[in-house]
């Protein structure tokens, strides 16, 4: 059978002077950055859902793409054909990882037993494809939001039978992820939220999803899964208000149910936009709270109130993101998954490559500039100087709980404190960042 992307052998690094649109201009996998290969810093992954499952439909139009595996026919045979094309794409794009939802790779079927049988078959197919290609699984997850049964949520559903079906999907997807050597397992609460408080018991739903997550953690330890569990925050869409609104909200939830040491976050840039935050803010918040895990690299449109899932193309924005990640020691089990899709009018199959190549070059440049910022050290020095007072005897006594409010009041009076404001030098810092980026 002829390959689907028959006009391309493999995308390779050709340098910034190349005019080849099917080549990397900045992403050189073997280039050493801060003592580590660029590929090992970035840990790129392509996603199954936007790339091979979306047919181009939107709220106002039908499918626009010609994808042979999306035509009518035997569902399992078409899933196998899709897997063949997917791994051809992963290989030719030269990405080390991929990600999937259960029903991205396997037909859901007409019953729970059909779902289980189909997924078992496709897990074996994926294992064969991974072994033949060398492509690995960054993370797996379960789609507990598309089917009509999940109209009122999965773990937060008012019906415990729906909760049980969702638990079966997550149980099965976790086992498949472990079997395939997945390095993480993601939990995104697509419909874990509400449309109106008039028919919603917030306390009840919070208890339900808390218990669900506890069961996921219990299953991880029971089976010996060595990967990281990740929650992906999102404020709204498809529901009006979702319980995993942003990083800070997720952390509060994890603390309530004693899970802050068990589950980290997978941060999507577009979801940060929807929450009214910068991507930089969400990354820095997760790192500060000790729950940073992985990234869905994309971008949203700040003028639109929905998830546009465009490919990342802002080197400036992503340099600051990579700066935070590098300062924190880089990825461990996580990586940069492109949760992004081509535009509906981009109907040429090679548009899939153009989108990913541009995104990979963007993140490669961001990594290089972030490394310059790390090596130069000026930004860190300015921040350290700004907070230096907290390393003094007074600062340490406060932080270590050795002074009460009354004692601090007495100290201030006895020492006749009269502190003066010190400049934050924001403009200077912004100029420095621009010089790293533009010279």
From Swiss-Prot:
Sequence positions that bind Mg(2+) 2: 268, 271, 307, 309
EC number: 5.3.1.5
Co-factor binding comment: Binds 2 magnesium ions per subunit.
Top-rank taxon, per record: Bacteria
InterPro entries: Xyl_isomerase-like_sf, Xylose_isom_bac, Xylose_isomerase
First-listed, main subcellular location of the protein, grouped into a coarse class: cytoplasm
Record-level GO BP terms: D-xylose metabolic process
Cellular component aspect of the GO annotation: cytoplasm
Reaction catalysis annotation: alpha-D-xylose = alpha-D-xylulofuranose
Keywords, in A-Z order: Carbohydrate metabolism, Cytoplasm, Isomerase, Magnesium, Metal-binding, Xylose metabolism
Coiled coil: none
Entry's localization field: Cytoplasm
Residues annotated to bind Mg(2+) 1: 232, 268, 296, 339
GO molecular function: magnesium ion binding; xylose isomerase activity
Cofactor(s), by name: Mg(2+)
Family according to the record: Belongs to the xylose isomerase family.
NCBIfam families in alphabetical order: PRK05474.1 (NF003998), xylose_isom_A (TIGR02630)
Subunit structure, interactors included: Homotetramer.
Descriptive protein name: Xylose isomerase
Native species: Yersinia pestis bv. Antiqua (strain Angola)
The encoding gene: xylA
